[in-house]
From Swiss-Prot:
GO biological process entries: defense response to fungus; killing of cells of another organism
Species this protein is from: Cenchritis muricatus
Keywords associated with the record: Antimicrobial, Fungicide
Protein name: Antifungal peptide
KW Transmembrane helix (keyword) present: no
Superkingdom to which the source organism belongs: Eukaryota
Record's keyword annotation contains Nucleus: no
Amino acid sequence: SRSELIVHQR
């Protein structure tokens, strides 16, 4: 999901 990608962008 996109949420996982956002977490990685932190």
